[in-house]
């Protein structure tokens, strides 16, 4: 699930998060609207109401602890040679994070963080808008 980073300041609503459509590349903002009598989750399709967006960062994070853990497990299992093998095999898997600023027709401005797959779906949804 995409991570809502904040930005919408409206006392009548509470943002729950940003979700990706199950069978398509669209995204919804999920929120409670306190002006309504029910506390049902409301959804707003971002692609249909987007005025503008801007990608502000794209980062690749890696975990150095993974390699150290692999080395320790290998060392404990078979000594120094296995420690080196464990460090080499465990590697440092990297993961991407993209932060995007959005502005909707209703005036809402917010930031959302997407992983690699969500970002691909985001780009696909934005390409369909054109």
Language-model region placement:
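A composition-biased, non-transmembrane "mature-region" signal
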Residues: 1-130
């Amino acid at each position: 699930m995409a991570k809502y980073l904040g930005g919408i300041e409206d006392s009548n609503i509470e943002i729950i998060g940003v979700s990706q459509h199950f069978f398509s590349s669209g995204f919804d903002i999920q929120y409670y609207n306190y002006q309504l009598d029910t506390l049902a989750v409301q959804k707003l399709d971002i692609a249909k109401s987007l005025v503008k967006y801007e990608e502000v960062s794209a980062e690749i994070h890696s975990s150095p602890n993974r390699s150290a853990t692999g080395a320790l497990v290998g060392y404990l299992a078979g000594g120094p040679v296995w420690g080196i093998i464990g460090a080499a095999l465990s590697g440092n898997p990297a993961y991407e994070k993209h932060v995007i600023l959005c502005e909707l027709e209703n005036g809402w401005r917010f930031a959302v963080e997407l992983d690699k797959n969500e970002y691909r779906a985001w780009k696909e949804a934005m390409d369909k808008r054109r």
